[in-house]
């Protein structure tokens, strides 16, 4: 099977979501995770969003193209790309739960 960037991104998000759901089952039981290509609307004051969190809707949307294209990795290989995508999932979950990303995934969170 041909492995595309889209498949790779979805797989990385899926494994990261599975990990955080295992770590925080009660807190994330009703949270919806979605992937979209880009955020709608104009960039905010901090630039292009990588994700959007809605606490009211219990929803996290990760934006694939900004995450992929605006990552400034010191080494552009599969491990670093996967780690960066996972870190975005962990930071979005931390934002939703009002916690620090290191608390969300102490064994896997890597700051980029």
Task: Tell what function each PLM region has.
Residues 11-66:
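Auxiliary, metal-adjacent structural segments of Zn-dependent hydrolase domains
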Residues 48-86, 96-112:
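Active-site scaffold of zinc-dependent metalloenzymes
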Residues 89:
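A conserved beta-strand element that flanks and buttresses the S-adenosyl-L-methionine
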Residues 6, 21, 77-78:
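Short, structured coil/loop segments at alpha-helix boundaries
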Residues 92:
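Walker B catalytic acidic pair
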Residues 3, 7-10:
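Phosphate/ribose-recognition catalytic cores of enzymes acting on nucleotide-derived substrates
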């Amino acid at each position: 099977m041909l492995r595309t960037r889209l498949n790779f991104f979805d797989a990385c998000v899926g494994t990261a979501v599975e990990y955080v759901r295992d770590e925080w089952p009660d807190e994330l039981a009703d949270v919806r995770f979605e992937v979209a290509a880009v955020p709608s609307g104009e960039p905010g004051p901090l630039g292009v969003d990588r994700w959007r969190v809605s606490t009211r809707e219990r929803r996290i949307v990760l934006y694939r193209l900004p995450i992929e294209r605006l990552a400034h990795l010191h080494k552009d290989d599969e491990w670093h790309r996967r780690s960066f995508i996972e870190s975005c999932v962990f930071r979005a979950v931390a934002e939703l739960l009002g916690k620090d990303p290191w608390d969300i995934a102490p064994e896997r969170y890597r700051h980029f």
